[in-house]
Every structure is written in structure tokens, then in C-alpha cells.
């Protein structure tokens, strides 16, 4: 397995980049090839994933190890291949992607290219609880919320349950609530606005 390639950006097109290293040009498929355009003729490091099947041998490349790990995890989901995984990562919402999986927010996941209801549910089934080890360095605040905020949000969730809302309904709005810094009452008001839409 090739961990990374250090070289110069020789060529960029909509599907891939070519990284030149010691006279060899490596064709590397990436989520956003043009994000490498600014580094043209500069030495960079691309973290690679080697994809091997009977009729396919391809290199996929990423700016960070975390991005590469998410790509590898997405490939484990039934119904998602390399092109689909690249399209999801190309949306550039990695933190929101992980948060939506953890919160079982299939509506948000369906916003990603090529992800329908069935694939979104499969992503949650296959990946929930398996991404925390990948993302702490990249998204330090995702799994470590301030205690005061966590308590306020927890109290709001309990209040919504007491009002008769099901866990499934509540979990759909939790990612939106986590983006705010509110009191318990503030979280409840915001949640009700979202739930009553």
C-alpha cells in the first residue's frame, strides 16, 4: 500500500491530478482536483488510497489522512463505490457528514450527490459509532461539547420527549441544535420551530 506521494502537481483536470515524482507521473483521482491547482509546480504531499479490483487499479488522493480514512469507511457501505465516495467528500462538509451519521439524520445525508434514502440508512447502519476514532484531530469539537451546553441540550431533548415527540423525530433536529449555543429553553423553542415546519 502506498501511504503518500510527495511530488509536484504537473496536471489538473476535472477528474484527477497528475503528481510527478522522480520522473514518474501518478494519476490520482481526488474529490476536488482543482483544489490542487494553486499548488501547481510546487511540491506537495498527497495521502493515497490504492483501489484494486479484478479490472481496476486506481489511486485516490486526499489532502489529509482523515479525509482518506473517511473515504475508506464510505467504501465499506453497501451501494457506495469510489465515485460515489468521492462525490460525497467533494461536497466539502466532512464534519456535518459525520455529525449527521452519528445523529441518524438521513434527511441531511440525502443532500449529498448520489445518496438516496436507502443509501443514507445504510450509511447510518454501517458507520454510526465507527467514526469517532477518525475525526477527533480534524474536528476536535465534534464529540467534545462544553458540559454546560451538553446539559442544556440533554434537558431540552428530555423535555421534547415529555411533550410526546419520538426519538426519531428529535434526532432529525439535533444536528441543527448542536450548531447553536443556547439555554435549555432556547433549544426547546428552536426544536419546536423545526419540528412544526
Curated annotation (Swiss-Prot):
Record-level Gene Ontology MF annotations: ATP binding; four-way junction DNA binding; four-way junction helicase activity
InterPro entries: DNA_helicase_Holl-junc_RuvA_I (IPR013849), Hlx-hairpin-Hlx_DNA-bd_motif (IPR003583), NA-bd_OB-fold (IPR012340), RuvA (IPR000085), RuvA_2-like (IPR010994), RuvA_C (IPR011114), RuvA_C_sf (IPR036267)
BP terms from Gene Ontology: DNA recombination; DNA repair
Subcellular location: Cytoplasm
Alphabetically ordered keywords of this record: Cytoplasm, DNA damage, DNA recombination, DNA repair, DNA-binding
Region (Domain III): 149-197
Region (Domain I): 1-63
Entry GO CC: cytoplasm; Holliday junction helicase complex; Holliday junction resolvase complex
One Pfam family matching this protein: RuvA_N
Span list, region Domain II: 64-142
Ranges in coiled-coil conformation: none
Chain positions covered by the region annotation Flexible linker: 143-149
Domain notes: Has three domains with a flexible linker between the domains II and III and assumes an 'L' shape. Domain III is highly mobile and contacts RuvB.
Known partners and oligomeric status: Homotetramer. Forms an RuvA(8)-RuvB(12)-Holliday junction (HJ) complex. HJ DNA is sandwiched between 2 RuvA tetramers; dsDNA enters through RuvA and exits via RuvB. An RuvB hexamer assembles on each DNA strand where it exits the tetramer. Each RuvB hexamer is contacted by two RuvA subunits (via domain III) on 2 adjacent RuvB subunits; this complex drives branch migration. In the full resolvosome a probable DNA-RuvA(4)-RuvB(12)-RuvC(2) complex forms which resolves the HJ.
Function: The RuvA-RuvB-RuvC complex processes Holliday junction (HJ) DNA during genetic recombination and DNA repair, while the RuvA-RuvB complex plays an important role in the rescue of blocked DNA replication forks via replication fork reversal (RFR). RuvA specifically binds to HJ cruciform DNA, conferring on it an open structure. The RuvB hexamer acts as an ATP-dependent pump, pulling dsDNA into and through the RuvAB complex. HJ branch migration allows RuvC to scan DNA until it finds its consensus sequence, where it cleaves and resolves the cruciform DNA.
NCBIfam families given in the database record: ruvA (TIGR00084)
Family: Belongs to the RuvA family.
Name under which the protein is recorded: Holliday junction branch migration complex subunit RuvA
